[in-house]
Amino acid sequence: MEQKYDVIVVGAGHAGVEAGLASARKGAKTLMLTINLDSVAFMPCNPSVGGPAKGIVVREIDALGGQMAKTIDKTHIQMRMLNTGKGPAVRALRAQADKVLYQQEMKSVIEAQDNLDIMQGMVERLIIEDGKVLGVETVIGTTYLADAVVLTTGTFLRGEIILGNIKYSSGPNHQMPSIKLADHLREIGFDIVRFKTGTPPRVNSDSIDYSKTEIQPGDDLPRAFSYETTEFIMDQLPCWLTYTNGETHQVIDDNLHLSAMYSGMIKGTGPRYCPSIEDKFVRFNDKPRHQIFLEPEGRNTKEVYVQGLSTSLPEHVQLQMLKTIPGLEKADMMRAGYAIEYDAIVPTQLWPTLETKKIQGLYTAGQINGTSGYEEAAGQGLMAGINAAAKVLGHDELILGRHEAYIGVLIDDLVTKGTNEPYRLLTSRAEHRLLLRHDNADLRLTEIGYNAGLIDEFRYSRFNNKKAAISEEINRLSQIRIKPNEKTQSMIESRGGTPLKDGILAIDLLRRPEMDYASVVALIEEQGMIDESVQEQVEIQTKYEGYIQKSLQQVEKVKRMENKKIPENIDYDDIHSLATEAREKLKEVKPLSIAQASRISGVNPADISILLIYIEQGKIKRVN
């Protein structure tokens, strides 16, 4: 039995659903294959979406025409804006998800999508001929043909769950692992690494004494990830904060020899920025306590996620540890935490489109590329789906620059630098983070999403109207002069500012740190009716104009380097002046531009100068 598609997506987690939807929405006939249809967009770890950097990725996914933002807006139990006391570059939205509702909503979306077929089945091998992918074969012998395949296998590849001294084959949440496909990828020559992640225990809400914890409510203001959301969930559930203590740490110390992390049973590299409680105890032994957040997993379940207590200690030790924590003395553990090891490919084997260098038409996205996190997976899935469909349909491929999106930073880091541990996106990884803000994702990316075929005409028209409104309001404030009358002076002094000596343009008054848009406009006779999102942009663009201009100047310098393309047929062995390490790294990564080459670890400025001279002199030796 054979069926033919344009694009096949293997897996239906957070990367898979975005890849499948993007491909189908671009007009490619798409098939999504998944081990279990009941686990579409499942959240095996924390029941949340967003946070620092990650929340901005969710906004970017939405601006490009992806799905994650819309789904979490419909299914969250709480939403909070983080870092509101800091500058706009680090503000980010975070939502607690109703994980079951999130799954159900996402499954409904993919089931209703035109051009997208969904099938339960386990892929065991790729069909490859002359270095090009032709399709996939399942464990029951069914063959599906396609011109492009996107692998979004998550932590299922040779997945193994570890709990104390027990280790067994399993995908996340004790699902069936993918063994044969993992072996197949090794057989066809991919470099594979072994990574590890983990999850904490879940406890019954009725067994928690919340009076001993600190309430963590959601924001009172309506919040949303998607620019299209108009209905907001105001009936929110709180989370709760408690702490470990000396007694907790004593239980860990007494049983550290039983932890798979320290017994030698776990061989995979774990995530630096999401350590287990054992790891935190060992690495930060001077800390008297560690934060523990109690997060409801949904509105219709008693399960509470014990965030901060990820562990691979035996089940009885986990329960003993829980009972030392204030509020959890009588905790009823419903699920034990565990560690999971899995295979991932070395991501420098990918082009920036997420197509593999080894096999034409084969793309990978999500944790198979060495990342951690639902948001990082979804962003990659979206880009892989766009590019797989573009390849088949003859459209232009899409590569986002580091100055355009956190998704661009993420993918460039992976394919240029690689990673020796599960990669987590951080604001500190973005050198242009003032340009990559939560508030301006639509201004950065909606045009790109429209050109890629994922943004409809109605939304694109609204976006253009918003852009025009921002420009018009900045121009208006640049022409209105505010007099130093009693009302003006009183307003400025009440906000801790220095009184005016003379009249001032409204736009210049807005630049003062103590003034905001509302207070400036209150001093103008013709106030106008301006949308809140437009007000926000006018204020940020005005107050941070100098810093933004500096960032844009830096971007222009980088763009000049990006425009210096490295010919595909370059032979690095022919450039004798290159350092040996630089030559090896350049041959491995195969950078597309001088800028990308300069970001490779082990390639220094002297090597870049040599490479530039070689290219500019036209000394390109064709590779046989």
Swiss-Prot record:
Keywords linked to the UniProt accession: Cytoplasm, FAD, Flavoprotein, NAD, tRNA processing
Pfam family, one: GIDA_C_1st
tRNA processing is among the record's keywords: yes
MF-aspect GO terms: flavin adenine dinucleotide binding
Cellular localization per UniProt: Cytoplasm
GO CC, one annotated term: cytosol
Chief localization: cytoplasm
Cofactor(s) needed for function: FAD
GO biological process, one term: tRNA methylation
Coiled coil regions in record: none
Binding site for NAD(+): 270-284
Transmembrane intervals: none
Keyword set includes Chaperone: no
Top-level lineage group: Bacteria
Residues at which FAD binds: 11-16, 123, 178, 367
Family from the record: Belongs to the MnmG family.
Function: NAD-binding protein involved in the addition of a carboxymethylaminomethyl (cmnm) group at the wobble position (U34) of certain tRNAs, forming tRNA-cmnm(5)s(2)U34.
Subunit structure as annotated in this protein's UniProt entry: Homodimer. Heterotetramer of two MnmE and two MnmG subunits.
Protein name: tRNA uridine 5-carboxymethylaminomethyl modification enzyme MnmG
Organism from which the protein derives: Macrococcus caseolyticus (strain JCSC5402)
Gene from which this protein is expressed: mnmG
